[in-house]
Curated annotation (Swiss-Prot):
SUPFAM superfamilies in alphabetical order: GroES-like, NAD(P)-binding Rossmann-fold domains
Subcellular location(s) per record: Cytoplasm; Nucleus
CDD domains: QOR2
Any single Gene Ontology cellular-component annotation: nucleus
InterPro entries: ADH-like_C, ADH-like_N, GroES-like_sf, NAD(P)-bd_dom_sf, PKS_ER, QOR-like
Post-translational modification Phosphoserine, affected residues: 191
Keyword Metal-binding: no
Protein name: Probable quinone oxidoreductase
Enzyme class: oxidoreductase
């Protein structure tokens, strides 16, 4: 049997994504081979592909997937067996039919949760948790800005923040996206260009407690301008381009804080990972979180999937279907 996968041998546009075939990997002694049902797409996949972030070449993209255990290493002590339904996080390797991963960031999935939902929820759900509990821990009554609020993380942030009685001012590029943000928990939604005025009106000139910004350079100024004295900007993406540096004078005058978090910096081991994942599954099963999937591409359509996410025209999550026989698992 062969293993269809996507490989990047040089950095560049989406055309550098090569679909190739290799042998199915054998499990490492302390690892699992996962037969992937779905791999999740994330903006960081494009940052690595373009060279904005460094990756060892050649590499297989993809940081998350859901599937079933196909093989278990002979030294694995954790409770995994062939056939288990699982999700996992990995530095690289999810854009493949089969992936060899250590057990550290692998978690079982309830039979009640379809694997496509589990894959769509995992990385972005955990990202949203860490943004509002670690990067800037929100409090009841806070007012925050969520940029790109109709994207995968943005929609989850709106829902989680509403559940915590936090007031959300959302930004999105179109009226349709702004309506989606309102439906998912934002109190008010506006264009990127109107944010400064909307924040001033909504907060009576005080400013917001925090701004969660995945857009990058295009919204840097408006995010900082929106903050109250002592407010916090949480920068967690570069969809419009990277922020190279921030002069300290932009922060010092109003005692602003700037945070650049990383999910993998917070997920420090299996216990932490399992704690977040178990909460995520409970919220999904309790119908407290709506997981929006924008489109599912075939694994061989990775280029088209990257083009779609980079267009910034999507809402919710993009997935790659890795094994068609697991499409309904």
């Amino acid at each position: 049997m062969s293993n269809l996968l996507v490989q990047v041998s040089k950095t560049g546009p989406s055309s550098v994504l090569q679909v190739i075939t290799k042998e199915i990997p054998k499990p490492a002694p302390n690892g699992l081979v996962i037969k992937n049902a779905y791999a999740g797409l994330n903006y960081i996949d494009t940052y690595l592909r373009t060279g904005l972030y460094t990756a060892p070449l050649p590499y297989i993209p993809g940081k998350e997937a859901a599937g079933v255990v196909a093989a278990v290493g002979d030294k694995v002590e954790a409770d995994f067996k062939v056939g288990d339904r699982v999700v996992y996080l990995t530095p690289f390797g999810a854009y493949a039919q089969y992936t060899n991963v250590p057990t550290t960031l692998v978690s079982k999935v309830s039979e009640k949760i379809p694997l496509k939902i589990a894959s769509a929820a995992l990385l972005q759900g955990l990202t949203a948790y860490t943004l509002i509990e670690e990067a800037y821990p929100v409090k009841t009554g806070d007012t925050v800005v969520v940029h790109a609020a109709a994207g995968g993380v943005g929609l989850l942030l709106c829902q989680m923040l509403r559940a915590r009685n936090v007031h959300v001012i959302a930004t999105a590029s179109t009226a349709a996206k702004r309506r989606i943000a309102i439906k998912n928990g934002a109190e008010i939604a506006c264009s990127y260009e109107d944010l400064t005025k909307v924040v001033a009106d909504y907060t009576n000139g005080k400013g917001v407690d925090a701004a969660y910004d995945s857009v990058g350079i295009d919204t840097l100024s408006s995010s900082l301008d929106a903050l109250r004295n002592g407010g916090t900007m949480v920068s967690f993406g570069n969809a419009s381009g990277a922020i190279d540096a921030i002069p300290l004078k932009f922060l010092s005058a109003r005692c602003l804080k700037f945070v650049r978090p990383s999910l993998f910096g917070y997920i420090t081991g299996h216990a932490v990972f399992e704690g977040y994942v178990s909460r995520l599954w409970k919220e999904i099963l309790d119908n407290n979180l709506n997981i929006a999937i924008h489109h599912i591409f075939k694994l061989s359509e990775a280029k088209e999937a990257h083009d779609a996410i980079e267009s910034r025209a999507t809402t919710g999550k993009l997935l790659l279907l890795c094994n068609e026989d697991l499409a309904d698992a």
